[in-house]
Amino acid sequence: MSELTHVRADGSAHMVDVTGKNETSRTAVAEGFVKMRGDVVKQLFSAGLPKGDALPVARIAGIMGAKKTPDIIPLCHPLPLGKITVDFFELTDGVRIEASVKTRGVTGVEMEALTAVSTAALTVYDMIKAVDKMAVIDGIRVLSKTGGKSGDWSVQ
């Protein structure tokens, strides 16, 4: 079983030392869902919400979220992010959000991909809550990662 890298033997948290690691190309893809009524899905994808066109706003929020990850998640290293994409896929009962993040660095970008999805999902929720108070954010997870000492990984 792997040990937690952010916790010392005495239980105290610390930022992992990555200064001795080699830079490699790294990517991570994450997804999440915002479940909502079908009529709200139609409003969301036709830019018909009372608050306006939510998807472009949520895309920018997701990109900003990825860039701000080390500011809001303790112990995350600041990374030079080379590429961030946030995409939305229409479902009958909501939207699937997928974020992809890429860097050339000494640590992975899974947290940045998760933060991009989370921030985009929160923004969608904020913009639909007036018309669907029962909306739910769900299923946020990493789908894949590449690069680094531990190698490539995918849910498939």
Curated annotation (Swiss-Prot):
Residues the record marks as active site: D126
Superkingdom as given in the UniProt entry: Bacteria
Catalytic reaction equation(s): (8S)-3',8-cyclo-7,8-dihydroguanosine 5'-triphosphate = cyclic pyranopterin phosphate + diphosphate
Pathway in which this enzyme or protein is active: Cofactor biosynthesis; molybdopterin biosynthesis
Keywords linked to the UniProt accession: Lyase, Molybdenum cofactor biosynthesis
Enzyme Commission no: 4.6.1.17
GO biological process, one term: Mo-molybdopterin cofactor biosynthetic process
UniProt cross-references to NCBIfam families, sorted A to Z: moaC, PRK09364.1
Identification of the protein by name: Cyclic pyranopterin monophosphate synthase
